[in-house]
């Protein structure tokens, strides 16, 4: 008999998604709903530092490579399971919108947190 928990759709926690987007949007906010967080600026670093701390607080292993790319890893399927990577960026175009890149980062975290909340046992990390 199939595991109904594994096969049933799980919804992303909209409250979590909104809260994380609100927080990351503080870094470089123009105050009028816009965002200015170009790469390698203090606002970009602050957003990266916040996101790294957010992942660590949720039990992820956080790595930063030689050029500053930020990686979060959590083992949900065992040490030998294949890995799925989700990527985006926390910097923005000058005067880009609040969803410029950051939404992909935040949505990836929220998706993985959905697996954890729903006790889904994925076949990959």
For each predicted feature, which ranges?
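Catalytic-core environment of secreted peptidases
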Residues: 70-103
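Alpha-helical metal-binding/catalytic segments enriched in His/Glu/Asp
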Residues: 86, 96-125
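N-terminal hydrophobic or amphipathic helices/low-complexity stretches enriched
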Residues: 1-31
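Structural signal for hydrophobic packing residues in well-ordered secondary-structure cores
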Residues: 21, 25-28, 32, 58-59, ...
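A generic structural signal for short
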Residues: 9, 39-40, 100
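General structural feature for long, well-ordered alpha-helical segments within catalytic domains
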Residues: 13-20, 43, 47-51, 82, ...
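A non-catalytic alpha/beta surface segment that caps or lines the substrate-entry region
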Residues: 29-75
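Short amphipathic alpha-helical segments at helix-loop
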Residues: 5, 32-36, 93-96
